[in-house]
Amino acid sequence: MERNLLNERFITIEKLADGELSHKLPGLTVKFSFAETFLGEVLVASTPQGVCYMAFVVRGRDMAESEMMNRFPGVFFEIGTDEHQRRALAALSADEENMETVPLHLKGTDFQLRVWNELLKIPFGETATYGEIAAALQNPKAYRAVGTAIGDNPVAVLIP
């Protein structure tokens, strides 16, 4: 499988907290806002380190906000935008010459982060099966766990 250097070059992932062990993230402030994109309306949220959540608004803003808040129990939410959000939104429509690095600050297990990093390597316009991703992670029998990790991706708009 040919690598997707565009995604790997412009999206960086930092671990926020271990999703299995962290039920509360006290002291963390998450800024969030709504924005229109050519794909539809999205809710984008960020910590001071990077974008932590980005999803389409499908069932209204209240439901989107509630779904986001359920992912981050115990944190302080603040309506607002920042540079991380601006870069994430710009990445949806930017060409390679004008693209800036989008730092992600994701809550997930070590395995989930490995899967999400592997998704960045899938070439634009191509697909990979759960089995292919599991094999690339040197764990070919973990295809179901790969599927679960993909389903839990909090920034599927950026890492499809």
Summary of predicted features, one role per range:
Residues M1-K141:
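Basic nucleic-acid-binding alpha-helical/helix-turn surface characteristic of O6-alkylguanine DNA
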Residues K141-P160:
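Short glycine/serine-rich loop segments
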